[in-house]
A protein has these predicted regions:
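Sec-dependent bacterial lipoprotein signal peptides
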Residues: 1-18
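OB-fold and OB-like single-stranded nucleic-acid-recognition modules
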Residues: 18-176
């Protein structure tokens, strides 16, 4: 009997260790489209209006207010296992805007940081990026996971960067 319990405990530990890590609570992602067609989203953003989606991006502009933070991002692809970060783009991609109705620490808002967001799509909005006003796909974040890479590093560069050994700081933010 003890041997069976020991085998069961070992198998449970092994299976748990092999499980795919998740970024967000299942209550946040249960109704989510994990990798929506971004080309359609850009061509006709209102097609996804009212949908819950998971998007990935690189921060290019941040505008804070008392209500929260508006992030304008370069779209990146979501990989098979989102917890490992977005897929880096070798060429410039389209942009989108996401509003996080809460507080994100200053290091989480650095230009170049990569993020994954679980969000509700809204109507496209006019956003100001470096003085140019453009209509962009617009979402309101439920939860957001940020890899604090800054603009000079990719997620894959950590923990061994040219500056030495630094573990990659990352954090998940969920609105209450």
């Amino acid at each position: 009997m003890r041997m069976i319990a020991l085998v069961f405990a070992s198998l449970s530990t092994l299976l748990t260790a092999c499980a795919t890590p998740t970024l967000f609570p299942s209550s946040v992602t249960s109704d989510m489209q994990l990798n929506p067609d971004f080309g359609v989203m850009v061509a006709d953003p209102d097609v996804f209006k009212g949908s819950a989606v998971q998007l990935a991006g690189r921060i290019i502009d941040v505008q804070t207010s008392t209500n929260g933070t508006l992030i304008v991002a370069q779209q990146l692809s979501v990989q098979k296992y989102p917890a490992y970060g977005p897929v880096e783009a070798s060429e410039p991609t389209t942009q989108f805007a996401v509003f996080y109705p809460g507080t994100i620490d200053p290091a989480g808002l650095w230009t170049g940081n990569k993020f994954m967001v679980a969000a509700d799509m809204k109507e496209s909005q006019m956003v100001n990026v470096d003085g140019a006003i453009k209509r962009e796909p617009y979402a309101v974040a439920r939860c957001m996971h940020v890899w604090k890479t800054g603009q000079y590093y990719d997620i894959a560069d950590f923990p061994h960067s040219t500056d030495g050994y630094y573990p990659l700081e990352e954090q998940t933010y969920c609105r209450k």
